[in-house]
Amino acid sequence: MSKGPILVTCGLPYTNGPCHLGHLRTYVPGDMYVRYLRHRGEEVVFVCGSDNHGTPIVVSAEEQGVTPKELSLKYHHHFEETFIKMGIRFDRFGMTDGKANHHRTREMMQRLIDKGYIYSATVSQSYCTTCSRFLPDRYVEGICPHCGAVARGDECDQGCGKHLEPGEIRDPVCKVCGTRAELRSQEHFFFKLSAFKEFLGTFLKGVRGTDNAKNYALGWVNDDLHDWCITRTLDWGVKFPGRDDLVVYVWVDAPVGYIAFTEEWAAAHGRDWREFWCGDGEITHFIGGDITYHHCIFWPALLKGAGYGVPSAIVASGMLKIDDHKFSKSRGYVVWTNDDYLDLGLPADYLRYYLLAYTSHTKELNFSWQAFADRVNNELVNTFGNFVHRTLHFAHAQGIGIPDLDADQEILQRIDETIAAVDTAMDAFEFKNAVDAVMTLAAFGNNYIQTAAPWKLIKTDRPAAVQVIRNCLQLVRALALLIDPTMPETASKIWMMLGETDQVRDHRTSEATEPLTAGELAPPTTLFARMEEKEVATLEKTLMMRVEEAEKRGQPTEELISIDEFGKMKLIVGTVISAEKIPKSSKLLKLIVDLGSERRQIVSGIAKFYDPEHLVGSSVVVIANLQPVTIFGVESRGMILAAGDNAALLTPNQAVEPGTPIR
């Protein structure tokens, strides 16, 4: 048991578009974890809310002819309703544009100002002469100064993943009108992130959670830590103290929402929010893998500087693929939670189960309708549902009901072992392992009833057959309690079929081995329906039609370059001499490449697709005249060219000498 109350949060959904499967990889595991803790007897408060500020909201609102407030309210209600349908039960679901968050954000800024952690500085920022305005964040696109990839104004989302400060991006272009932006000076405010380097190093080594969150962040902290610009030139947002022309950067006020939403919950329940943020409470953040930088570096430093408690655990999910393709709304590789699933009448529990059972939480999840249907049919219908229905149907049909007997010790021991396995998995945030342990118990039950064959035994030894069913009913009770965090609607159905009149969620998992109340049983209902091939084909067709429509629309027209500009790139063939992984990075390899006249060290983001030893001797195409950049503390003097989601290396179709130019 924890010393104090536990606060669990989920990364805030952004209110500029509807819910999709990528969102659910954060919220379903978070909800499962909270339900599990409550079954263990812990006091848990589960908060989240919608993220309403930042340039994407403003840009989307302008495109749709509505105000940012109207757009935010529309999608706030959308997410709130979708989460309820998915069985995700937040104790408080607030808005970052609410009064509580405006107040708490400004209060935190003032604390940091008073402690000397915020200072002003004049910076060069992209300015569009056509639109006559400064271009914060996603109003601008350009080239990442660190790795040379196409990047947004505040983040290199296509390359190294680094946060970008205002004015850092190279060759900036206005996203609204396409005009090449110019740099102009403007006063902004900075948070002294560099002062927290030692604290962050210690914090990241001690915080619980998933390694993908901690290790990436440690790499950034050990590399370099720059002070952080925390204001933007926008009207929409939380006003910076004393400045009506500046708002607080969205990646400051969004996580502050965790505190504000806790305050709102506490006010409604007669509690003090400081129990969680200033006392002995535990704070666990569930986030998407793409926002680890903000939650593992910026946020703990802000909390420490302002005198609040810091997170106890940070749990980051892996990425998502759709049918072996990188998740992409613009290319049609997306599954919408409502349009493609809930609105078709498909049960929320099926999708919850699939998301939790498919793979480890930190690994990439490759969704396909066929794989989804296979798991529903083979695991839920054939294994779990089959055992529960066989047991309850036989107990009812033979007039056995719930007999006034004790379950055999072997059965109780097997349940205890399963509970221990679930506890171990959940403590390590290995949600798949926890689900697997429960499904193993269901498979054990299936094998037990099949081997014991009570339908035969009852003809010759009714007491023995009754004991078998009593044992099976104990397993069914255990399965209801253990599967509730994963499939709450299914667990409630089982609980009711066992004749219980209260809610399964109000019971502890340790009660799984307690005796059942003897009595009659009503006829059971079917838990799961098989997914037929025709249904799967229809779902697959919908996805493929979306992809085809996206291909017809094509991608936005890109700015053309002249042949002279293209000619500035020095493309040559090189041979990989050595390759090794870069510590604390799952994506990057350090390559030594023979370019004929010299050997170059190049960092390449292909570690997920190639073993280092297999690259040695390979011919590759290199951009050889890029400015050197440092990535994860390693200097890179060039770029290896690769194509597609699987990073297929570009190579000549016949042998050529290192240093041969591409023409």
UniProtKB/Swiss-Prot annotation:
A motif ('HIGH' region) lies at residues 13-23. GO terms for molecular function: ATP binding; metal ion binding; methionine-tRNA ligase activity; tRNA binding. Keywords: Aminoacyl-tRNA synthetase, ATP-binding, Cytoplasm, Ligase, Metal-binding, Nucleotide-binding, Protein biosynthesis, RNA-binding, tRNA-binding, Zinc. The keyword Cytoplasm applies. The keyword Ligase applies. It comes from the Archaea. It catalyses: tRNA(Met) + L-methionine + ATP = L-methionyl-tRNA(Met) + AMP + diphosphate. InterPro entries: Anticodon_Met (IPR041872), Met-tRNA-synth_bsu_C (IPR004495), Met-tRNA_ligase_1 (IPR023458), Met-tRNA_synth (IPR014758), Methionyl/Leucyl_tRNA_Synth (IPR015413), MetRS_core (IPR033911), MetRS_Zn (IPR029038), NA-bd_OB-fold (IPR012340). Its cofactor is Zn(2+). GO terms for cellular component: aminoacyl-tRNA synthetase multienzyme complex; cytosol. One of its GO terms (biological process) is methionyl-tRNA aminoacylation. Is required not only for elongation of protein synthesis but also for the initiation of all mRNA translation through initiator tRNA(fMet) aminoacylation. Belongs to the class-I aminoacyl-tRNA synthetase family. MetG type 1 subfamily. This is Methionine--tRNA ligase.
